[in-house]
Design a protein with these regions (language model features):
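Short, P/G- and charge-enriched loop/turn segments at secondary-structure junctions
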Residues: 52-57, 101-105
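Short regulatory "switch" loops immediately downstream of catalytic or recognition motifs
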Residues: 34-40, 87, 121-124
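Intrinsically disordered, low-complexity, positively biased terminal segments
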Residues: 2, 59-63, 83-88, 126-127
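Short amphipathic alpha-helix that is part of the acyltransferase structural core
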Residues: 2-55, 61, 66-76
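Residues in well-ordered beta-strands of folded domains
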Residues: 14, 83, 117
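Short, His- and charge-rich active-site/binding loops that engage polyanionic ligands
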Residues: 73-104
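Acyl-donor binding region in acyl/amide transferases
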Residues: 93-172
Length: 173
């Protein structure tokens, strides 16, 4: 189910739940291919969509927040997801880079780790990608900035890291 939380001239932002994960996975995989890879076999895309869907369903919990930008025709234009890590489930950060936040940052139980991911924007939508990024990121970091004992963890490329730093986020790698 999706709940509209903001409306703008050309789009609306929705807070969504696990029911949207399959559609969200299709959008994310296709956008990632457009931005980073280019052309690929449709069978590979289908496999990647299935993998992302499974991973997101495995990670989904009570403290998961999914935000989706849709145009007025219900087409997804952007997305971001944040969840409170339970310290047990393997994070994408661990799977991809072998980095465990408990070893890299703090293991003290007073600290919370929020994973931000599944950020994607359709750059061909005709809407400022920077504006969409700022709006989605502001929603995603709400539970993090409200708690001095919270850390945001994410897998990001150098371009996105520069944007995060320009917005005033203190980052480390």
């Amino acid at each position: 189910m999706e709940k509209r939380i903001a409306t703008f001239e050309d789009y609306s932002i929705f807070k969504a739940d696990a029911e949207c994960i399959n559609e969200l996975s299709r959008f994310i995989v296709k956008e990632n291919y457009k931005h980073h890879i280019g052309s690929v076999k449709s069978s590979q895309i289908a496999d990647d969509i299935a993998d992302v869907t499974k991973e997101e369903l495995d990670l989904y919990g009570d403290n998961t927040y999914i935000y989706i930008v849709r145009d007025h025709h219900e087409k997804i234009l952007g997305s971001i997801r944040v969840f409170l890590w339970n310290r047990q489930t393997e994070l994408p950060l661990e799977k991809i880079y072998g980095i465990n936040p408990l070893k890299a940052i703090h293991s003290d139980k007073k600290f919370n780790y929020w994973h931000v991911g599944r950020f994607a924007i359709d750059s061909a939508a005709g809407i400022s990608t920077f504006t969409l990024f700022k709006r989605l990121m502001a929603l995603a970091v709400q539970p993090i900035v409200g708690d001095n004992n919270s850390y945001m963890v994410a897998e990001i490329d150098s371009k996105l890291l520069k944007v995060m730093n320009a917005l005033g986020f203190v980052t480390g790698n």
